[in-house]
């Protein structure tokens, strides 16, 4: 069973490690989303795999006519909707049609870049790890943090960060233009 205080691996490696198509796809996703290594991609795939497995099990239990299946399905769909992975009013089939990009788009690193707080996806990662970004008033230093739909608009520079000042040279030009400062 293992020691409960020890962290355990949260991902699975691919079964065929040298498959050319998969490797090319992984490299493209790593570049697009600014991931540090393939392990981060595999963690996101594990999250996706978990929700797909739950979706398949719930569809099977609904087909058998189990009473709790509807309640559990609503809970899973509600959770994925809160994170913005699914749209409101989605059904169990939508869980099975999720893609890895749906998970990667909800990462804090991607959200910081998409909102224009950083010039590049790599700079977004650096801002987060150096503690320059806050979500809902709390400093977050984990680029893989999954941002909830309600917290999207609360992503900003941390108040104690030098980047919070208007004239900082590393601030994105999009933000300077949006706040009314000079570019």
Curated annotation (Swiss-Prot):
Keyword Ribosomal protein: yes
Domain S4 RNA-binding: residue ranges: 106-168
A GO CC annotation given for this chain: small ribosomal subunit
UniProt KW keywords: Ribonucleoprotein, Ribosomal protein, RNA-binding, rRNA-binding
SMART domains hit by this protein: Ribosomal_S4, S4
Coiled coil start-end: none
SUPFAM superfamilies assigned to the protein according to its UniProt record, in alphabetical order: Alpha-L RNA-binding motif (SSF55174)
GO biological process, one term: translation
A GO term for molecular function: rRNA binding
Superkingdom field: Archaea
Function: One of the primary rRNA binding proteins, it binds directly to 16S rRNA where it nucleates assembly of the body of the 30S subunit.
Family statement drawn from the similarity comment of this UniProt entry: Belongs to the universal ribosomal protein uS4 family.
Quaternary state and interactors: Part of the 30S ribosomal subunit. Contacts protein S5. The interaction surface between S4 and S5 is involved in control of translational fidelity.
Protein name per the record: Small ribosomal subunit protein uS4
Organism per entry: Methanothrix thermoacetophila (strain DSM 6194 / JCM 14653 / NBRC 101360 / PT) (Methanosaeta thermophila)
The organism's taxonomic lineage, starting at the top: Archaea, Methanobacteriati, Methanobacteriota, Stenosarchaea group, Methanomicrobia
């Amino acid at each position: 069973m293992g020691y409960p205080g020890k962290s355990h691996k949260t991902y699975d490696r691919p079964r065929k490690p040298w498959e050319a198509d998969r490797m090319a796809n992984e490299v493209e996703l790593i570049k697009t989303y600014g991931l540090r290594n393939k392990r981060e991609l595999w963690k996101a795939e594990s999250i996706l795999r978990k929700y797909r497995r739950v979706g398949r099990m719930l569809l099977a239990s609904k087909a058998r006519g189990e009473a709790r299946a509807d309640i559990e399905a609503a809970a899973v769909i509600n959770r994925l909707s809160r994170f913005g992975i699914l749209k409101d009013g989605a059904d169990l089939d939508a869980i099975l049609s999720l893609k890895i990009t749906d998970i990667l788009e909800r990462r804090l690193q991607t959200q910081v870049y998409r909102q224009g707080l950083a010039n590049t996806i790599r700079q977004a990662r650096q801002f987060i790890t150096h503690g320059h970004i806050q979500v809902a008033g709390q400093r977050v230093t984990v680029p893989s943090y999954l941002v909830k739909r309600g917290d999207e608009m609360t992503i900003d520079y941390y108040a104690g960060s030098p980047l919070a000042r208007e004239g900082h040279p590393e601030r994105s030009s999009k933000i300077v233009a949006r706040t009314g400062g000079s570019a």
